[in-house]
Curated annotation (Swiss-Prot):
<dbReference type="GO" id="GO:0005737">
    <property type="term" value="C:cytoplasm"/>
</dbReference>
<dbReference type="GO" id="GO:0006260">
    <property type="term" value="P:DNA replication"/>
</dbReference>
<dbReference type="InterPro" id="IPR036390">
    <property type="entry name" value="WH_DNA-bd_sf"/>
</dbReference>
<dbReference type="InterPro" id="IPR036141">
    <property type="entry name" value="MukF_M_sp"/>
</dbReference>
<keyword id="KW-0963">Cytoplasm</keyword>
<keyword id="KW-0106">Calcium</keyword>
<dbReference type="Pfam" id="PF17193">
    <property type="entry name" value="MukF_C"/>
</dbReference>
<dbReference type="InterPro" id="IPR033440">
    <property type="entry name" value="MukF_M"/>
</dbReference>
<dbReference type="Pfam" id="PF03882">
    <property type="entry name" value="KicB"/>
</dbReference>
<comment type="subunit">
    <text>Interacts, and probably forms a ternary complex, with MukE and MukB via its C-terminal region. The complex formation is stimulated by calcium or magnesium. It is required for an interaction between MukE and MukB.</text>
</comment>
<keyword id="KW-0131">Cell cycle</keyword>
<comment type="similarity">
    <text>Belongs to the MukF family.</text>
</comment>
<dbReference type="GO" id="GO:0051301">
    <property type="term" value="P:cell division"/>
</dbReference>
<dbReference type="GO" id="GO:0009295">
    <property type="term" value="C:nucleoid"/>
</dbReference>
<keyword id="KW-0226">DNA condensation</keyword>
<keyword id="KW-0132">Cell division</keyword>
<dbReference type="GO" id="GO:0030261">
    <property type="term" value="P:chromosome condensation"/>
</dbReference>
Length: 440
């Protein structure tokens, strides 16, 4: 950034308004550096809480600190990193207690880059992907054309290293900035709901829909260009297979493939996590509305009783006992008086109670593929099963089918290192990425 777009008073007011502060002592800074180093060695760019604790243990040993309180001090350090916006924490309702951590742009800026702030722009992303596609196509054409070492350095390695890789890093940074924006939107929604949730409903809906739309727009743009980018990378990789002296090009292509897979994968995972948060907020609003109805009725009833002598009123009721049973949990005890006994066909059965039975049925049905040595396409099989169940059961049924399928065998395509295509498994946007199982 060659020049500042804001004046000093504006920057000071902005920093004061957002209450920015960073406090990193030497041990905490060392911990952040250790996290960044280990994170750079991972292909998915994500770390679990256990991996963060292991990194903290190395730092603690280096500073000759006691190992008796390592768990408590590591937890405090992780929470402090999250509070200072150096790490982002993501939790999932399906994997309760297992959090995913990613370095924020601020964390990356401290350890590797200079700090940058950018707004998400679909046009900018489309232009970046267009430039990448052009560079990759020219590099692939040059690779298939062949030539001496200077030709490979000038026309293949250089564009991949200094153009494609940098744009991939820029897109990755954009995604991390979107992570930060999601956390800010969550904070804004929490503040709105704490003040006056009735007046905040429309604002919350706007924030939720805007963020969902932005995430979907980002992912759609990436997926639309992802196949073409991977195809050109594969062309370059095929061209280097006959040359033993081009390991540096082959390694760079592999790194670019990993970056592209990580970008697209995290985009879809981020959407799934945001959908869970969206449902949580809507559930909270619905609960608040139900509670508010009861609160308004109780308040009016108290006022009517208090002003009875000034403004007399009469109350007509059909069942005196029903007037006393105003709490939902007490009314639940009287349901049988209203509905009577349900027929056996309508008796509700918890899904967990039939889980083992369903797993056994699916295991028996899938065993036919192994017996006949027929390839098993998970995308088609899961979609066929989900069409037989309501949408609320799709996640549980899909998990059972996949668990049983992977026990039968493996896909030989997994050993090639190439990613499988995403296949839709229902009409609500759910997808699965898996090669065809053909070795039992």
């Amino acid at each position: 950034m060659s020049e500042f777009s804001q004046t000093v008073p504006e920057l000071v007011a902005w920093a004061r308004k957002n209450d920015f502060s960073i406090s990193l002592q030497v041990d905490r800074l060392s911990f952040l550096l250790a996290v960044a180093t280990l994170n750079g060695e991972r292909l998915d760019g994500e770390m679990s809480e256990g991996e963060l604790v292991d990194a903290f243990r190395h730092v603690s040993d280096a500073f000759e600190q006691t190992s008796e309180t390592i768990g408590v001090r590591a937890n405090n350090a992780i929470n402090d990193m999250v509070r200072q916006r150096l790490l982002n924490r993501f939790t999932s309702e399906q994997a309760e207690g297992n959090a995913i951590y990613r370095l924020t742009p601020l964390g990356i800026g401290i350890t590797d880059y200079y700090i940058r702030q950018r707004e998400f722009s679909t046009l900018r992303l489309s232009m970046q992907l267009s430039i990448v596609a052009g560079e990759l196509k020219r590099a692939a054409d040059a690779a298939e054309e062949g030539g001496d070492e200077f030709h490979w350095h000038r026309n293949v390695y250089a564009p991949l290293k200094y153009s494609v890789a940098e744009i991939f890093d820029s897109i990755d940074l954009t995604q991390r900035l979107m992570d930060e924006q999601q956390q800010q939107v969550k904070d804004d929604i929490a503040q709105l709901l704490n003040k006056d949730w009735r007046a905040a409903i429309s604002s919350c809906e706007l924030l939720l829909s805007e963020t969902s739309g932005t995430l979907r727009e980002l992912q759609d743009t990436l997926e639309a260009a992802g196949d073409k980018l991977q195809a050109n990378l594969l062309r370059i990789q095929d061209a280097t297979m006959t040359h033993d002296d081009l390991h540096f090009v082959d390694r760079l292509v592999f790194d670019l493939q990993s970056k592209l897979d990580r970008i697209i994968s995290w985009g879809q995972q981020s959407i799934d996590l945001w959908i869970g948060y969206d449902r949580h907020v809507h559930k909270f609003i619905r609960t608040a509305i139900d509670m508010d109805k009861n609160r308004v009725f109780a308040q009016r009833l108290r006022q009517s009783v208090q002003t009875y002598f000034d403004e007399p009123w009469a109350l007509t009721y059909a069942n005196a006992d029903r007037l006393l049973d105003m709490r939902d949990e007490e009314m639940a005890l009287r349901d049988e008086e209203v509905t009577g006994e349900l027929p056996e066909d309508l008796e509700y059965e918890e899904f967990n109670e039939i889980r083992e039975q369903l797993a056994a049925i699916i295991e028996e049905q899938l065993a036919v593929y192994k017996t006949r040595q027929v390839p098993l396409d998970l995308g088609l099989v899961v979609r066929e099963y989900l069409s037989q169940y309501p949408r609320a059961r799709h996640f549980d049924v899909a998990r059972i089918v996949i668990d049983q399928a992977v026990r039968l065998g493996v896909a030989q395509a997994d050993f090639t290192g190439l990613p499988a295509k995403w296949q839709p498994i229902n009409d609500y946007g759910a997808k699965v990425q898996a090669h065809v199982i053909d070795k039992y």
